[in-house]
């Protein structure tokens, strides 16, 4: 890992940031899910408290953040939580193709699938994704009386929501299940409500996430990941994505990492070098997301606490 000589000097000055660092700035893109918000503020906290730089946070979906990073003008400089292969189309275009975005080589491992509460799983003997197609199970998940059980497949703008919409079709569940897109807070409230009422509810779930600390839930079994049965075309690649996709197996494990505008190395080189060394674990992200979602703490609060509690790890990221 490269040594940051200038950072060593800066680290010895507790009350003031050097003017050279004050000149460096970064705009951090903040996706909607709690883990991404937590990571965004960890990045920002380290930039401000340890590097002495200036930080701005801009909310946005995946497409907007990648397009802004591609422009390289500082409108948005970094995406805090890139899931691959979910967002592979953006990486193919902007990282591999145009080279305008740089992808971190320090990912943590993510997992995703479809879940129900443990109580509902036990009560209705629901352990496999195909169990959602049993009429009595679908009826127990139908809260609005339209004849179909509800399944939250993700938030608007999420690539994973598109994957799950195709999954519902290709697992033969469309006659029984209604795919729903809504913000994640709606999903969390619905899970809590369904457990309290003893109702069924299926939902997209992933690790790391606060959900595993908040509720007793189980991920449903799916056929093992098979590339031949997992051909996903995203809308930004083809408007006929739904008809050209086929997803009938479990998602592969995910590599999750940050990505930043390649031009940041010229505009804010110290920050860019820190980004290249930045590294978290799935456990880090789950715990911070839990503090936000279950305990009502702000991303700023959990990020500051994490940075203070992990000073040695931060030192390593800064080359100290």
Regions found by a protein language model. Give the residues of each.
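Short helix-initiation/N-cap motifs at beta->coil->alpha
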Residues: 33-34, 54-70, 179-190
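Short, polar/charged alpha-helical segment
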Residues: 35-53, 166-168
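Ligand-binding pocket segment of bilobal, Venus flytrap-like solute-binding proteins
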Residues: 68, 76-81, 152-231
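C-terminal lobe and pocket-closing loops
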Residues: 213-274, 278
């Amino acid at each position: 890992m490269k040594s940051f000589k200038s950072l060593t000097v800066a680290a010895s000055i507790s009350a003031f940031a050097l003017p050279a660092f004050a000149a460096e700035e970064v705009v951090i893109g903040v996706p909607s899910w709690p883990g991404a918000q937590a990571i965004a503020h960890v990045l920002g906290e380290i930039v401000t408290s340890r590097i002495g730089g200036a930080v701005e946070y801009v909310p946005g979906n995946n497409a907007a953040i990648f397009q802004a990073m591609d422009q390289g003008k500082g409108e948005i400089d970094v995406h805090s939580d890139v899931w691959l292969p979910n967002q592979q189309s953006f990486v193919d275009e902007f990282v591999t193709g145009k080279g305008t975005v740089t992808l971190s080589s320090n990912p943590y491992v993510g997992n995703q699938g479809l879940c129900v509460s443990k109580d509902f799983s036990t009560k209705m003997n629901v352990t496999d994704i195909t169990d959602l197609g049993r009429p009595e199970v679908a009826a127990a998940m139908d809260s609005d009386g339209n004849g179909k059980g509800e399944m939250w497949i993700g938030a608007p703008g999420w690539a994973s929501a598109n994957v799950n919409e195709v999954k519902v079709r290709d697992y033969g569940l469309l006659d029984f299940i209604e795919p729903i897109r809504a913000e994640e807070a709606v999903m969390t409230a619905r899970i809590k409500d369904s457990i309290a009422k003893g109702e069924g509810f299926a939902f997209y779930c992933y690790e790391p996430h606060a959900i595993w600390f908040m509720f007793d839930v189980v991920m449903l079994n799916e056929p093992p990941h098979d590339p031949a049965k997992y051909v996903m075309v995203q809308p930004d690649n083809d408007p006929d994505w739904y008809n050209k996709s086929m997803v009938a197996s479990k998602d592969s494990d995910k590599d999750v990492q940050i990505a930043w505008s390649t031009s940041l190395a010229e505009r804010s080189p110290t920050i860019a070098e820190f980004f290249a060394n930045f590294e978290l674990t799935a456990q880090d992200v789950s715990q911070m997301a839990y503090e936000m979602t279950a305990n009502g703490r702000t991303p700023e609060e959990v990020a500051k606490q994490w940075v203070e509690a992990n000073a040695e790890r931060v030192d390593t990221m800064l080359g100290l």
